[in-house]
Amino acid sequence: MAVISMKQLLEAGVHFGHQTRRWNPKMAKYIFTERNGIYIIDLQKTVKKVDEAYNFIREVASEGGNVLFVGTKKQAQDTVKEEAIRAGQYFINERWLGGTLTNFSTIKKRINRLKQLEKMEENGTFEVLPKKEVIILKKEMTRLEKFLGGIKDMPGVPDALFIVDPRKERIAIAEAHKLNIPIVAIVDTNCDPDEIDYVIPANDDAIRAVKLLTGKMADAILEVKQGEDNVAPETTEEVVADAE
């Protein structure tokens, strides 16, 4: 059975592409028809592609890999954060900082600085420092949290990227390509599908569409995690019996 139904996709408006004058000819194979100057995406293909993406993300999770959710456009920011957190993964929903993947060691230094400032706030250091200095430090902490909060616990470069709107996330895609990190993405009719390993042809501007598809990718990770939670731990007796 498909991960997602045609009915769910229709209700979320996943089928609405961009205006016909704003399109990438490489997306032609995913277009069903044109209506009132707007391309309509072939949802039968979307259903199939969601299945492929879901299975890939599930595979990454089953091997203990990490997925970085990326969506900095307004319609994606809240969803990307919520779904990544729900799946116990990482996210970037503000500006992508150049070098986030290709220069992760430098980014890690900024993350360590953020953690240092958080610790200073927690252990009361801010209370004994001059007021002016505290204002400057808090400002720095807020800025670092804004851009790096979603990846501050990410142990290293992720094993896969999930992206909402590849046109918006050009730098993220270029960095992932350099490091051979596979990309899953919601790809609208104005995008280049050749840049993406797992294309999900869909409307990337409607909040409901973004939420539905991003939620399914989070579900793939949770399916693995819940499966692990349901595996009963071996008892001491079983371990001893196996040894004998």
Curated annotation (Swiss-Prot):
SUPFAM superfamilies, per the entry: Ribosomal protein S2
CDD domains named in the record: RPS2
Homology family: Belongs to the universal ribosomal protein uS2 family.
Protein name as catalogued: Small ribosomal subunit protein uS2
GO terms of molecular function: structural constituent of ribosome
Family matches, as Gene3D superfamilies: Glucose-6-phosphate isomerase like protein, domain 1, Helix hairpin bin
Organism expressing this protein natively: Exiguobacterium sibiricum (strain DSM 17290 / CCUG 55495 / CIP 109462 / JCM 13490 / 255-15)
Keywords for the protein's UniProt record, in alphabetical order: Ribonucleoprotein, Ribosomal protein
Database matches in PANTHER family: 30S RIBOSOMAL PROTEIN S2 PROKARYOTIC AND ORGANELLAR (PTHR12534), SMALL RIBOSOMAL SUBUNIT PROTEIN US2M (PTHR12534:SF0)
Lineage: Bacteria, Bacillati, Bacillota, Bacilli, Bacillales
